[in-house]
Amino acid sequence: MANIVIMGAGIGGMPAAYEMRDMLPKEHTVTVVSAVDYFQFVPSNPWVAVGWRTREEIVLKVGPLLERKGIKFIAKPVTTIDAAGSKLTLSVGTPDEQMLPYAYLVITTGPKLSFDEVPGA
């Protein structure tokens, strides 16, 4: 039995989790880890800005959506990746600190923008 961990519950992580769960035998575990417990459909943000949608219409709680498909969900930030040891550390330095072993890791966290590091920006 393998534990597949997907970091990120966004526009890449959610479909990746659904596809893995559909394709893999049930004895394998699929777990999604995200620092937040919701999915925001970012391409719809302009609709909120112009009043065509509300924030509540484009933000969904992730846990129930994944668990309904047999996918585990952990709403904690990943603070370290131990690639050699095949494990993640979640919430380092807090009472909720947790180690999460994996057989396979899929990183779908998206970009972290650093506009201030671009000359002239």
Predicted region positions:
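Beta1-alpha1 glycine-rich phosphate/pyrophosphate-binding loop at the start
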Residues: 2-75, 120-121
